Design a protein with these regions (language model features):
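A generic structural signal for tightly packed, nonpolar segments enriched in small/aliphatic residues
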Residues: 216-505
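Generic detector of short alpha-helix boundary/capping microenvironments
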Residues: 3, 10, 27, 83, ...
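Short amphipathic alpha-helical segment within the helicase RecA-like ATPase core
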Residues: 21-270, 274-277
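Generic structural signal for beta-strand residues in well-ordered domains
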Residues: 15, 31-32, 315
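Residues at the start of alpha-helices and the adjacent loop-to-helix junctions
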Residues: 2-3, 7, 104, 187, ...
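Gram-negative bacterial Sec-dependent N-terminal signal peptides
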Residues: 1-22
Length: 505
């Protein structure tokens, strides 16, 4: 009996996604022979039963075609074949999955994104994907769900400012062994990708439209999901003694905001996610120069990742107690701005000499970390920020840096990152002696040493005895090209990483 499950557009509607198109996915136990393009998989071992069955049905034409193409089934290798006359398809894509043992959910998601981009570029409207027993393993539901997840992530586009946005997308039918199990796995991923889309759109939006107040307004829309939103304005921030956060926002008319988004899915001690939310970073009086300043609208990507994760946890109805604390400000130049040489007083009580006004992220995070510890007493605290150019020079944009006082958390998060293609590389703590100041307790930049490490060591002063992780995602927030699950614009980095980690631990 044919079983078909069509997925709703609920996650798209809940994402405040600015894209107008949405890929359509149907999971079925029967092949859709009316589709334009058929996609079938082929491992290096050549064990795929469905390929062999189709090849027999098509009188050996598929095998002859892949032999002519010297197709070996390597991962992401594609042989595009004009469909045999006896089929209703126009084309057949034979897609390599590499070695059977290496084809996991992360590989499936990347492949889904790249195949989707190929189909969109070729103006394909409908595609049938055979995912029935592609590996000989019992993981086909998870692989199919993640392939669809990758396709949908790649489909997301931010094109609100284009006169003629590209609205073309693809309707998919997946031939799977267990459509109900596949749909259940995809439903959870659909909730997570709603959080990713939110983070991407917040990050990609231009700075004049995505101010601290507008970011707060976007967060307020999540209350219908059972998320408690609290906002502290500049006067409240100042009253609490959060002098670092208050000072960074002085250069902008809006001032700073502290945004708290709390999803309480359990009575356990909370896990606090702390996000840097600099909606535009001019560098202040230590002003940035060069073309990179155009990317500084994305300096709030850490806060976007935190808000997207809290949303994802609410949509998945996770049994987790997660509080997101986001330090929002625009680092601008005006007569009210912090000047190099100023001394600020943090809520922790430590004074900080501002040697460089472009090292503002650690200042706003310091007060946000203090707030999370004081008012939520979290079991674990993880901060995420586009913090240092030094991280980009050390690791590029394929990895984010992870620095921590807890080896177990590093292992958990690094493993989670591998599962979702958001990779982490550990850097050490140290060089605290370089943060000394002659007139204050701390300098906001190190006098020497590796910049990513000295920035993390500054933040360590505000972690207390809490198990703490710092993630520096500088270079990971924006991409200019489509690749794997990513489309141009904000990446939403961190949402899938945190969601995978929270749901698995």
């Amino acid at each position: 009996m044919k079983t078909t499950i069509k997925l709703s557009a609920a996650a798209l509607l809940l994402s405040t996604c600015i894209s107008s198109q949405a890929a359509d996915f149907v999971f079925s136990s029967q092949l859709n022979t009316a589709a334009q393009t058929l996609v079938v998989f082929y491992s290096q071992e050549g064990k795929n039963k469905q390929f062999k069955a189709l090849n027999k049905q098509f009188d050996g034409q598929l095998q002859r075609a892949v032999e002519i193409e010297n197709f070996a089934g390597n991962y992401a290798e594609v042989a595009e074949i004009i469909a045999p006359q006896k089929s209703n398809f126009s084309r057949v894509l034979v897609v390599g999955t590499g070695k059977e043992e290496d084809f996991d959910k992360a590989s499936a998601a990347k492949l889904g994104g790249n195949i989707h981009a190929r189909l969109v570029a070729n103006k394909v409207n409908t595609a049938s994907i055979i995912f029935d027993d592609i590996t000989g393993l019992h993981a086909n539901a998870e692989l199919a769900a993640n392939f669809a997840h990758g396709a949908n992530l790649r489909d997301h586009r931010f094109e609100k400012y284009k006169q003629k946005p590209n609205t073309h997308t693809v309707s998919y039918t997946f031939d799977v062994t267990d459509s109900k199990q596949t749909q259940a796995k995809y439903a959870q991923l659909e909730s997570i990708q709603a959080g990713v889309f939110l983070a991407r759109d917040l990050t990609t939006e231009v700075a004049t439209e995505m101010t601290p107040i507008e970011f707060v307004n976007a967060a307020q829309k999540l209350t219908s999901l059972g998320i408690k939103i609290t906002v502290l304005d500049p006067a409240q921030i100042k009253e609490l003694g959060m002098g670092a956060l208050e000072a960074v926002g002085r250069g902008s008319k809006q001032g700073s905001r502290l945004l708290i988004a709390h999803y309480q899915g359990s009575s356990d001690a909370p896990i606090a996610l702390i996000g840097k939310g600099i909606t535009f970073d001019s560098g202040g009086y230590s002003i940035k120069t060069g073309s990179s300043i155009a990317r500084m609208k994305s300096d709030m990507a850490g806060a976007a990742a935190v808000l997207g994760t809290v949303k994802a946890m609410a949509l998945t109805k996770a049994e987790k107690n997660v509080v997101g604390v986001m330090a929002m400000a625009a680092n601008m130049v005006s007569e009210s701005s912090v000047a190099p040489g100023d001394v600020l007083r943090t809520a922790e009580g430590l004074s900080v000499e501002v040697v460089n006004t472009d090292a503002e992220g650690r200042l706003v995070l310091s007060d946000a970390m203090w707030y999370a510890r004081k008012y939520f007493n979290p079991e674990i605290m993880v901060d995420i920020a586009t913090l240092t150019g030094a991280k980009v020079r050390a690791l590029g944009n394929e990895y984010a840096a992870i620095i921590s006082n807890d080896d177990t958390l590093v292992s958990q998060l690094t493993y989670a990152g591998k599962q979702v293609n958001e990779n982490l590389w550990r850097l050490p703590l140290g060089y605290k002696e370089t943060l000394k100041s002659d007139i204050a307790d701390l300098s906001n930049v190190g006098s020497s040493g590796p910049g990513a490490t000295t920035a993390a060591s500054f933040l360590e002063h505000f972690a207390g005895d809490t198990r703490w992780v710092h993630i520096d995602m500088a270079g990971n927030a924006l991409t200019t090209e489509g690749k794997n699950e990513l489309s141009p614009g904000g990446t939403g980095f961190g949402v899938r990483l945190f969601s995978e980690w929270l749901l698995a631990n």
